[in-house]
From Swiss-Prot:
Pfam families: TRM. One of its GO terms (molecular function) is tRNA binding. This is tRNA (guanine(26)-N(2))-dimethyltransferase. GO terms for biological process: tRNA N2-guanine methylation. Gene3D superfamilies: N2,N2-dimethylguanosine tRNA methyltransferase, C-terminal domain (3.30.56.70), Vaccinia Virus protein VP39 (3.40.50.150). Keywords: Methyltransferase, RNA-binding, S-adenosyl-L-methionine, Transferase, tRNA processing, tRNA-binding. Residues 1-336 form the Trm1 methyltransferase domain. Belongs to the class I-like SAM-binding methyltransferase superfamily. Trm1 family. InterPro entries: SAM-dependent_MTases_sf, Trm1, TRM1_arc_bac, tRNA_met_Trm1_C. The gene is trm1. Dimethylates a single guanine residue at position 26 of a number of tRNAs using S-adenosyl-L-methionine as donor of the methyl groups. The lineage of its organism: Archaea, Methanobacteriati, Thermoplasmatota, Thermoplasmata, Thermoplasmatales.
């Protein structure tokens, strides 16, 4: 079947939406936003040489070739997928080089300004190669679809894979992204490198983060100050479990200046939703309503009340009933109680 995405026309055996499959020429329709953002950021970063490390159908690398000024290399280990990618490169008359080899080999033999890590499942096996081989001041785009691991749903697996302890609660997706970035940062520090998060999203079944990579002991030492543990019982409200979670990334998830530069209408809704996600955690109205046996009021009304009390209040991408605010949890609870009495 033939798919049109962005400027590319792709021939694929099948189109699929969901966590992913191990099949030749795999095309995931749920990842269109992921690829749109990748195009936008590569254009903003101004990089010259790009590695699409997991070719699949070739759609990402072909779109980068057609929609940016970067030179593109597509790596793919599957012979069947390589044949599909060759066909799609020809269909689009794209200037993309296809290499039939695994990610680690290709990334270690050619210097790249941007490396895209979008594997089936966890990115963990590929992070060291990406961090070590991207050029100084270069960028990584990393996708993780192992959400159950990153959100603490499988505690032992979370410990094994990411060396972290996470409680699977209303904060699971923010904590999942902070766990992922924290792990990337720790791996970077092991090689005297450091990262600066540029953009981070949760979308459906995957997390996607973009980071800038620098080199140097001083930068690495400064970066690790942003990795640590948090206790929701002491930092949010005593109704939460009294445990230390982490290690996680405690600093910004997004580069605010970069977000302001992205004007693509295809991604504008998501960009607007993540603009205030740098603040650590949030207050969730569903959580408060459940604990206080109150009906859930309109989110906008509660945000207005919070701002009338002199605090900031913004939507968050991590929960449809979450508010990023500097208003204490207990005070938001009192605002809900007062609203319920009207």
């Amino acid at each position: 079947m033939r798919i049109t995405e962005g400027s590319a026309v792709i021939e694929v055996p099948e189109a699929y939406s969901g966590p992913g499959r191990r099949s030749p020429g795999f095309y995931n329709a749920d990842q269109v936003l992921n690829r749109d953002l990748t195009i936008d950021l590569i254009n903003e970063f101004g990089v010259e040489k790009v590695l699409d490390g997991f070719g699949g159908s070739g759609v990402r690398g072909i779109r980068i070739s057609l929609e940016t000024k970067a030179k593109v290399v597509i790596a793919e280990i599957s012979p069947s997928s390589c044949e599909i990618i060759k066909q799609n490169i020809a269909i689009n008359n794209a200037e993309a080089d296809l290499i039939h080899d695994n990610f680690q080999c290709v990334s270690s033999h050619i210097a790249f300004d941007y490396i895209d890590v979008d594997p089936y499942g966890s990115p963990v096996p590929y992070l060291d190669a990406a961090i070590m081989n991207v050029r100084k001041g270069g960028y990584l785009g990393i996708t993780a679809t192992d959400q159950s691991t990153l959100t603490g749903s499988t505690l032992n697996k979370t410990r094994r894979r990411y060396g972290a302890y996470i409680v699977n609660d209303i904060y699971r997706h923010e904590m999942g992204i902070r766990t992922l970035i924290g792990y990337i940062a720790r791996r970077a520090a092991a090689f005297d490198r450091y990262i600066e998060p540029q953009l981070s999203i949760w979308n459906h079944h995957y997390y996607r983060v973009f980071v800038k990579v620098g080199k140097g002991v001083n930068g690495a030492d400064k970066m690790i100050e942003n990795i640590g543990y948090l206790n929701k019982h002491t930092t949010i409200d005593n109704s939460f479990k009294d445990v230390n979670e982490g290690p996680v990334w405690l600093s910004n998830l997004n580069n605010a200046e970069l977000l302001e530069k992205i004007r693509d209408p295809r991604v504008s809704k998501k960009i607007e939703m993540i603009k205030h996600d740098n603040r650590l955690l949030f207050v969730d109205l569903t959580d408060i309503a459940r604990k206080t046996s109150l009906s859930l009021p309109p989110l906008a009304k509660v945000m207005d009340e919070i701002m009338k009390h002199g605090y900031e209040a913004h939507r968050t991408s991590f929960s449809p009933t979450g508010i990023k605010t500097d208003c204490p949890y207990a005070e938001v609870s009192e605002i809900l109680k007062a609203y319920a009495k009207r």
